């Protein structure tokens, strides 16, 4: 049996479509036929050679939902349900070792020293080869955390849980205060930013403000009920800051969430906060040029600045549950549905910020 795959062979080059033999499934592993695969902003960073974790060649794609085709042994999901052929599942993109200092002692597996990530640091040359979701089939290894999905779930919408959803949930773990009545500003209108904005709204934030440069993403934000959308390129930094201070009676935002993926957003984000506010850096996933930061502004305002790195099973599970309850909102985030053969065109749309969430639904 063969699988169609899209392989990155060289940085800054289009993905190459191939047909390859499906190898023997490792013990405890699953062969899964993709039903839907998400295209993520970090896929662009990978293609541009900005992520030092990435080996070549590689099948990209770390967000996926699919149907179990083959099981080598017994496999249970995170809820203890034994999996069978034909089950629909979603999987946690990161596979942790369960043995390192961060897994066993600190008990923060998202910091695992040996974390393997489908579609990010798993080479196409590494057995069992089919280790990314830009593929007709993917092979999930024994320690992969999966959740069996209901037949009623919108599978295309559910792919959002696998990366941006789980990472946003992780970020909200650091908010000690109740958001009821608060103002939350989200920098960046991609899936990570939109998921964060939706979480803030459903946790009681009075004002949710989204700063984004994409007209398409503004349309999506309005559909999901964001209170104020500021189009970045229509206002100067000073004007954007004033807009936030105007809706907070001159005090600034309680929480600001960086979801742009760019260091340049951080200096503005700190200025948007009230005294004692919290800044969550969620979108920075690759090394970038250094930027100047006024640490006096941080200390004199007694700010909490928290980095957020990926997610683990706890966040993944919550993201799946949240989407199950609010499918109608997250469905609005999907602006393009494409075939695997159209992946390079889809990546171009994403790079040009002409798309919200892109989902591959035809393989």
Where on the chain are the PLM-derived regions?
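Mid-domain Rossmann-like dinucleotide-binding core that forms the NAD(H)/NADP(H) cofactor-binding site
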Residues: 136-137, 150-234
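Cysteine-cluster motifs in flexible loop/terminal segments that predominantly coordinate metals
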Residues: 40, 92-144
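Short amphipathic alpha-helix with an adjacent loop that forms part of the alpha/beta core around
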Residues: 237-249
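Glycine-rich phosphate-binding loop and adjacent beta-alpha segment
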Residues: 205, 222, 227, 262-325, ...
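A generic alpha-to-beta junction signature in SAM-dependent methyltransferases
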Residues: 178, 248, 260, 273-274
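C-terminal hydrophobic helical "lid"/dimerization subdomain
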Residues: 1, 255, 267-271, 313-363
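Glycine-rich beta-strand-centered segment in the early N-terminal region that forms part
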Residues: 23-37, 51-104, 131, 150-151
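Local beta-strand N-terminus motif with an aromatic residue
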Residues: 181, 226, 252-253, 343
């Amino acid at each position: 049996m063969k699988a169609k795959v899209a392989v990155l062979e060289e940085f800054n080059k289009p993905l190459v479509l191939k047909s390859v033999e499906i190898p023997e499934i490792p013990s405890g592993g699953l062969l899964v036929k993709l039903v839907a695969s998400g295209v993520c902003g970090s896929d662009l960073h990978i293609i541009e050679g900005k992520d030092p974790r990435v080996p070549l060649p590689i099948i990209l794609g770390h967000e996926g939902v699919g149907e179990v085709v083959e099981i080598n042994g017994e496999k249970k999901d995170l809820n203890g349900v034994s999996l069978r052929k034909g089950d629909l599942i979603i999987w946690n993109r990161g596979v942790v070792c369960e043995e390192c200092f961060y897994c066993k002692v600190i008990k923060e597996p998202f910091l695992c020293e040996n974390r393997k990530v489908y579609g990010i640091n798993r080479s196409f040359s590494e057995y069992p080869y089919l280790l990314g979701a830009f593929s007709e089939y993917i092979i999930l290894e024994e320690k992969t955390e999966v959740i069996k999905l209901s037949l009623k779930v919108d599978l295309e919408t559910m792919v959002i849980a696998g990366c941006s959803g789980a990472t946003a949930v992780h970020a909200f773990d650091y908010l000690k205060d109740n958001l009821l009545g608060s103002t939350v500003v989200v920098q960046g209108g991609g899936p990570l930013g939109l998921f964060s904005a939706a979480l803030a709204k459903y946790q009681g934030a009075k004002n949710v403000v989204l700063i984004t440069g994409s007209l398409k993403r503004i349309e999506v934000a309005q559909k999901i009920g964001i209170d104020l959308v500021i189009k970045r390129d229509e206002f100067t930094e000073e004007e954007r800051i004033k807009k936030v201070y105007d809706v907070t009676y001159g005090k600034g935002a309680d929480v600001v969430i960086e979801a742009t993926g760019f260091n340049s957003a951080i200096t503005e984000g700190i200025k948007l906060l009230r005294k004692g506010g919290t800044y969550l850096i969620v979108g920075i996933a690759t090394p970038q040029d250094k930027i100047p930061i006024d640490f006096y502004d941080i200390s004199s305002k007694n700010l909490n600045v928290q980095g957020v790195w990926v997610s683990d099973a706890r966040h993944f599970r919550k993201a799946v549950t949240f989407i199950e309850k609010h499918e109608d909102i997250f469905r609005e985030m999907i602006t393009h549905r494409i075939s695997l053969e159209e992946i390079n065109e889809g990546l171009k749309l994403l790079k040009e910020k002409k798309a919200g969430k892109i989902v591959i639904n035809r393989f």
